[in-house]
């Protein structure tokens, strides 16, 4: 049977597709911009048909209606990363959080520590051979589909076709729902003086020919702003946003010096505007792979001069980093931070950077603290922290004693907190 006939046989409405999900199933949603909006909406709309579905995903870009009060009988969310629409549910006990490194998520599915009953995915239209691309969301979505008993795909004509190892054949999909809604977009944030100063300090650590990992938000965008005079930069990152695209167009990022996948931008997912999605569509420079490859520290380390740039909530004077909680309150997750810090530390000539504003709470709270808040999660241990950067400078911690680490961190804290930090330093050292 030709793939076109298979496709037509599997084509149903969103309501019909989700009706195939059985009670008490574990349902994995595609990640971030890849969230299959029509399928999720149909699931929530028909909530009364379900009892005890476990909803698993990382970042949700939608409204997260399945986590709202009154939904507990129908849905229980298991967050692998806590985002804006799921934070309240996790901290109030209506949802759960599973700590994990991003690169390990596919193994949770494949090794059946989290057996997948249903995968709800969003993919591109099929090519002439019947292959759909996972587009903006390869990450754990492809492994989830490969592990699931039931695969329901939202085939969106607006999903870009990304290359690499990013494909699923229509014969491997159980039900197909066609969609034409625009992909969710994330607009670039406005950059303030603090972010620009941090970006400039980070950029001073990046040499020509380096391979970069950056996240999303004001600080990564500020770093990119100060890379315009660099040469032959490369990208091996869990994600990219619009700023990377602009540096490619400017010729700054060309991936020529990469020692792994030379000439290629390697990512596992994307978040940005339609311009970015159009840029990656059928672009042979951009390749996506599942997160157990892209974020594996033993893969990352194969890039010489690998520079990872991540942020956090707090750093204490020993160099311990909390990136996911305020005390006991879970506000995000581990994500790929530790994956890339470890990979950069193992890389020949690599650098692992934690970049943060010196204060929080409108300047009332120092992010550099004597100790992490009670109950705060240690996301990155003091043994793995290399550089810490604020708007006031750079602290290089690798190889330093606890005493010298503390002094270096106090020197880049906000001036109004340095005296109190030094007083705590004197009590301990």
UniProtKB/Swiss-Prot annotation:
Q: Which InterPro entries match?
A: AcetylCoA_hyd_C (IPR026888), AcetylCoA_hyd_C_sf (IPR038460), ActCoA_hydro (IPR046433), ActCoA_hydro_N (IPR003702), NagB/RpiA_transferase-like (IPR037171)
Could you name the active-site residues? 238 (5-glutamyl coenzyme a thioester intermediate)
Q: Name one GO biological process term.
A: acetate metabolic process
Q: Where does CoA bind?
A: 215-219, 336
State which Enzyme Commission number(s) the record gives.
2.8.3.-
Which terms are listed as keywords in the entry? Transferase
Asked if Aminoacyl-tRNA synthetase is a keyword of the record, the answer is no
**GO MF annotations, alphabetized:** acetate CoA-transferase activity
Extent of the signal sequence: none
The family classification in the record reads: Belongs to the acetyl-CoA hydrolase/transferase family.
According to UniProt, the name of this protein is 4-hydroxybutyrate coenzyme A transferase
């Amino acid at each position: 049977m030709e793939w076109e006939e298979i496709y037509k046989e599997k084509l149903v409405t969103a309501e019909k597709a989700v009706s195939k999900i059985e009670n008490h199933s574990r349902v994995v949603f595609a990640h971030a911009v890849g969230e299959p909006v029509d399928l999720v909406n149909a699931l929530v709309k028909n909530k009364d048909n379900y009892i005890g579905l476990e909803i698993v995903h990382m970042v949700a870009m939608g409204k997260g209606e399945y986590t709202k009060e009154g939904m507990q009988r129908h849905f229980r969310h298991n967050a692998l990363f806590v985002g804006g629409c799921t934070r309240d549910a996790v901290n109030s006990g209506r949802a759960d959080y599973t700590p994990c490194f991003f690169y390990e998520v596919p193994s949770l599915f494949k090794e059946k520590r989290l057996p997948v009953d249903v995968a709800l995915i969003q993919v591109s239209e099929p090519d002439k051979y019947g292959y759909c691309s996972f587009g903006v969301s390869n990450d754990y979505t492809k492994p989830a589909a490969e592990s699931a008993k039931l695969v329901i795909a939202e085939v969106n004509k607006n999903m870009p076709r990304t290359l690499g190892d990013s494909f699923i054949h229509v014969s491997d999909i159980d039900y197909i729902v066609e969609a034409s809604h625009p992909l969710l977009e994330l607009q670039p944030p406005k950059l303030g003086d603090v972010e620009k100063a941090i970006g400039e300090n980070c950029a001073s650590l990046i040499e020509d020919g380096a391979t970069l990992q950056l996240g999303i938000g004001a600080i990564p965008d500020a770093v990119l702003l100060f890379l315009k005079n660099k040469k032959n930069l490369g990208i091996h990152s869990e994600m990219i946003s619009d700023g990377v695209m602009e540096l490619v167009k400017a010729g700054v990022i060309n991936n020529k010096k990469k020692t792994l996948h030379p000439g290629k931008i390697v990512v596992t997912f994307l978040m940005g505007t339609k311009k970015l999605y159009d840029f990656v569509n059928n672009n042979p420079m951009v390749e996506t792979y599942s997160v157990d490859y892209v974020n594996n520290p033993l893969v990352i380390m194969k890039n010489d001069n690998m520079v990872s740039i991540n942020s956090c909530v707090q750093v204490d004077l020993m160099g311990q980093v909390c990136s996911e909680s305020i005390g006991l309150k879970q506000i995000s997750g581990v994500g790929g931070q530790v994956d890339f810090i470890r990979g950069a530390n193992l890389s020949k000539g690599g650098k692992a950077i934690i970049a943060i504003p010196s204060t929080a709470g409108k300047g009332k709270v120092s992010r550099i603290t004597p100790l992490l808040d009670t109950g705060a999660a240690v996301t990155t241990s003091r043994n793995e922290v290399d550089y810490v950067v604020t708007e006031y400078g750079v602290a290089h911690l690798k190889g330093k004693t606890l005493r010298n680490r503390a002094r270096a961190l106090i020197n880049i804290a906000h001036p109004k907190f340095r005296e109190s930090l030094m007083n705590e330093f004197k009590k301990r050292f």
